[in-house]
């Protein structure tokens, strides 16, 4: 049987590091699980929506039963149209939840999952009131919307939501400081490289991280966040690093280079495709099999697909301190019923 990988193997005039990492991860999965079950058709979408559409059409015409990828949201939309017309499912790698749909599943690390985990954990730890300091970008928009939903569900009061243009956070920080005495948590869904500046501004404005628990997302699973003074003691949600570190060590041995962080998505998608081919017979890539509520185990932990194409992941909560992270709430190892 055949599955297809659609990835940006080339972009512009040259090869793509990300695309090469995804392709290598697919090869690793095939080699580690043993040959003979599937043939992977590798298709280059050139990082464009048109290229992705053409790649999907070629994959379907060559007999692919399942499409893995692509990476970019615009490409996922085009692949989804082709795949649905051919009654083929796709497991894509975009972080844009809007491109998920029935039959087009996202394996990526979604903002929504990070927000759900960290805000629910804060509520479990007795946090009652929260403020939000978020960049005015797509990531911030999704994070704020999801935080409001989780806060309503868990009973946390949202005392303030302040937005800022990336690189221009000072005024928003000042406004947050005015409610610092009324909150016990501050959620900042911004990237690690921004936090040195934002952190200094919070300190200058008098926001004490010893009194206000700082919360973040998997964007802080980055060395640049670990030595920011204002983030010492901060909590954030992310996959546990052990699985990726083990994968990366094997990858380095085989390819003499480091994988991109998202390489495990291609590895897990391929491993899943092979496992289902071996265990599920003709129904291997049906909706009922792919949306098994018990989920599946991958390099980054347990995950499952929802019928709407989104995913749920077992995430840990980590605390920053002294240039490293400590797991303070381990990722669940299974969903109800246990993973496949």
Predicted stretch roles:
Residues 1-340:
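Extracytosolic ligand-binding ectodomains
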């Amino acid at each position: 049987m055949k599955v297809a990988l659609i990835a940006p193997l080339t972009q512009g005039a040259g090869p793509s590091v990300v695309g090469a990492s995804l392709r290598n991860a697919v090869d690793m999965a095939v080699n580690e699980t043993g040959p003979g079950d599937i043939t992977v058709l590798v298709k280059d979408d050139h990082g464009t929506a048109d290229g992705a559409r053409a790649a999907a059409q070629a994959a379907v015409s060559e007999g692919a039963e399942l499409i893995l990828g692509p990476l970019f949201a615009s490409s996922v939309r085009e692949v989804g149209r082709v795949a649905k017309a051919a009654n083929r499912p796709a497991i894509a790698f975009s972080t844009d939840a809007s491109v998920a749909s029935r039959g087009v599943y996202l394996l990526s690390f979604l903002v929504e999952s990070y927000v759900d985990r960290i805000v629910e954990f804060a509520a479990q730890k007795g946090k009652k009131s929260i403020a939000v300091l978020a960049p005015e970008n797509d990531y911030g928009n999704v994070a704020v919307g999801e935080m409001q939903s989780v806060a309503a569900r868990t009973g946390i009061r949202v005392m303030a939501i302040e937005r800022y243009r990336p690189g221009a956070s000072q005024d928003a920080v000042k406004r947050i400081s005015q409610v610092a005495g009324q909150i016990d948590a501050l959620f900042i869904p911004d990237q690690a490289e921004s936090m040195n500046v934002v952190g200094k501004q919070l300190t200058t404005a008098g926001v004490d991280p010893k009194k206000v628990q700082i919360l973040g997302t998997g964007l802080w699973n980055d060395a640049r966040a670990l030595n920011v003074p204002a983030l010492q003691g901060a909590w954030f949600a992310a996959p546990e690093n052990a699985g990726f570190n083990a994968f990366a060590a094997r990858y380095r041995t085989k390819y003499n280079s480091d994988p991109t962080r998202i390489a495990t998505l291609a590895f897990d998608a391929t491993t899943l495709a092979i496992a289902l081919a071996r265990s599920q017979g003709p129904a291997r890539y049906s909706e009922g099999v792919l949306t098994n509520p018990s989920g599946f185990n991958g390099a980054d932990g347990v995950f499952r697909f929802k019928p709407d194409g989104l995913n749920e992941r077992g995430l840990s909560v980590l605390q920053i301190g002294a240039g490293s992270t400590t797991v303070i709430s381990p990722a669940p190892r299974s969903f109800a019923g246990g993973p496949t």
